[in-house]
Amino acid sequence: MKILDTEDKIIKILKSNTEMMMTEEDKLTHKNSTHCRFCHKELNGDSVRDHCHVTGKYRGASHNKCNINFKETPEEKRRVISIPVFFHNLTGYDGHLIIKGLNDKKFGNIRMIAQNFEKYMTFQVRHLKFLDSFNFLSSSLDKLSSNLAQEGEHKFNNTLNNITDQEQRNLLLRKGVYPYEYITNKEVFEETQLPPIEKFYSSLNECSISESDYQHAQDVWNKFNIKNIGEYHDLYLKTDVLILADVFENFINTAVEFYNLDPCHYLTLPNFAWDAMLRKTEIELDQLTDIDKYQMIEKGLRGGISMITHRHGEANNKYLKDYDPSKESTYLSYLDANNLYGWAMIQQLPESNFNFVDKELSEILSTDDDDNHGYIVEVDLHYPKELHDLHNDYPLAPEQMIVNDNDLSAYQLDLKNKMELKNSKVGKLVPNLNDKKRYVLHYRNLKYYLDKGLIVTKLHRVLQFTQSNWLKTYIDFNTNQRAKAKNSFEKDFFKLMNNAVFGKTMENVRNHSDIQLINDGDKFTKLASKPKYKSCVIFDENLVAVECHKTTVKLNKPNSN
């Protein structure tokens, strides 16, 4: 395999140890340095020269201890060299093609992280660590390249270096078009002209390409003197790879410029964003070690509500073609909160000193939103019947519950029986008008619920903590950078850097899967005989994916280490 040959060459480079080379400018920079390049604290005479051991390039001044402790990557700390290999949509599709080719013992132990048998986030073969660029830039390559092109063609270094003709360059600085469903066998590659436009139809999108896209395909065919569809196919793939390289390298450059971190050392954008946040805020969060406190907070994490309260609406007003003046004028409104995640994350948030305390309800309710101390409470709530009609469209205090027949109206039961539907065995987050028992929530939510008419019938537990707006520095930084952004690529990037952190603040490690890829029959037999064995998917006689029950769970999120 050519990629394995390339791996050997890269390993030789990474294992090299080049002496430091300093220019006169480097020497002057080092002499005038006042802060460590690693910890950013003052040097105060404790200054050594840090350099890249691969290139020999001087990187900056640092404390002696910081320089000794620094490792290029987490893998290097374990003396393991990993070479990142990026695919766009590796998790959802492309990864399957590669995995099915790993059915040989020569590839050794294959390390992987998977969500399930269909979605492989990353897997490592020898030193090659396969990653999904879509987990960082969750848009189509077409949109990503279009956004980047707003800044100019100089952003596409890889593409420009491989294509010298300017007219050809202009054609390739965008996502190409391809007749996916027309290519059904290798004989099609011998055809000497593009298929008609209707053959570019996509069942997934339920449409064909536009006339301008088809003209673009013809221009590419003619300008590159393509002889058959096979050559068109190869150029299409080459262009995709070059554009992805340009897009991701620009993403890396932006990340390093603003956060001094390289995304290639992370699995997903949320992983990267969390470390970027820790660098910006320098926050040290308390790590919960009391299981009762941890489980109480877990109980309050319910997810987001997704529901339809009004199933069908029609507008009738003078701006519509079918306006009926004899009927009442009505409008449909679409409402969206700007920077909702950002606003939520600049509030006072739990930070440290989590302790169970004895507090009166009145004392909790009188605590200001921006007080130095906050509370998570466990209460019984009564939902007065006189509020049911008023709150029916959007009840307060939603709950995770399995919906049974007793929870359905007569109309819903009739509909269920007519359609022969079965009750779901999976819990859903359901807004309802029932009373609540041992309901866990933040004290600001409790104040809101009581203001709207709910009643606390019993206060069970109170978890007090020190709070501050410790995320505000990071959120404001990204918001300001987004306002200064010169193109859509950067605007989307800084928005994602805020939103990605939100999910990491409430990551549920219990949901992590333990899936292994086995290409050794003896190893599979040994694993399948263990009590933790759960299930497997057989790819062929030499390759199987095995899922195991987790024997331990490390409750270590969120953390600031």
PLM regions and their residue ranges:
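Metal-dependent nucleotidyl/phosphoryl-transfer cores and adjacent nucleic-acid-binding surfaces
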Residues: 1-561
